[in-house]
Structure formats: C-alpha cells, structure tokens
Amino acid sequence: MNLLILTFIICGLLTQVTKGSFEPQKCWKNNIGYCRRRCLDTERYILLCRNKLSCCISIIISYEYTRRPPFRVIHLEDITFDYSDMGSFTGSPVSKLSDLVTFDIRRETMTPKTNTPETTMPPSETTTSKTTMPSSKTTTSKTTMPPPSQMALTHN
C-alpha cells in the first residue's frame, strides 16, 4: 500500500516537472513573449532571457491576451465646478487669519512691591475674549458655526 502511494506521488511530481521543462519559457510583461534561441519571422527580439536566449514577442496582434481599453474622451461640457463654498472666501492672502477673529488686548504689568502680574484693561477699549462672527445673509439658522480652520480659536 505504501509503495502504491509513493508511486502516485512520484508520477504527480514528474508530470509537473516535464511541463515546465518541455514548454518554452515565457517572458516580458504578463508573459506574452517566449524565450528562444532565434526569434521566428513573425516575432521581434525585445531582451535577453537566461542561458543566452532571446525574449521574442509576436509582431502580429494576438487576441488571446487582454489589451488595455482605450482612453475615454472627456468633453469640456461635462466638467462642472462647485462654487457653493466661494461665499466664505474673504479675498485675503494665505495668512490663515480671518478678520472675523478678535483678540483679547489686556496689558500685564509687574508691580514692583509684590512682584505679581497685574492685568489692566484700557478704559476706552471693550473687547471680549470670545470669537465674534457677523451674521450672514445666506444662512437661515440663528446659530452660526465658525469654519473648521477657526474652530481652534474659539473659546467656549
């Protein structure tokens, strides 16, 4: 019984080895060429394979290989742009700072007697530490959220 199983295994491996050795070796992209000593009249030399063999690719178009589909034609009428976010554009250069942000202007001074910081507000200026957003004519809701780039500047 063991001898029978061993012969089946050897026969199976032998068929795999003979397929690889008697068939011409494939080469080039997606294995469309064959490695030969001399290319046929309907083939063209591309590069060298192992053991001084040439990689030969057929000149005649073969339909057994899948070809790349042609590029789609893009018409200019089909291209559209979304201008919905252009209303929030301020026209400022790339400074990343918006005019909608107010900064807290407090002056800190050191008292010479106690060496503690003392914060004073100028009497004519009244500012808040929160970000103020002007009311927009295009929004219908009462509460307006600042843009995502300004979310870090808001203090809730």
Swiss-Prot record:
**Protein localization:** Secreted
Q: Where is the signal peptide?
A: 1-20
Give UniProt keywords alphabetically: Antibiotic, Antimicrobial, Defensin, Disulfide bond, Secreted, Signal
List, as start-end ranges, the regions of compositional bias called Low complexity. 111-144
Can you name this protein?
Beta-defensin 125
Q: Does the keyword Iron-sulfur apply?
A: no
Spell out the Pfam families in the cross-references.
Answer: Defensin_beta_2
Task: Name the species this protein comes from.
Answer: Macaca fascicularis (Crab-eating macaque)
- Chain ranges passing through the membrane: none
Q: Does the entry feature the keyword Transport, yes or no?
A: no
Gene label:
DEFB125
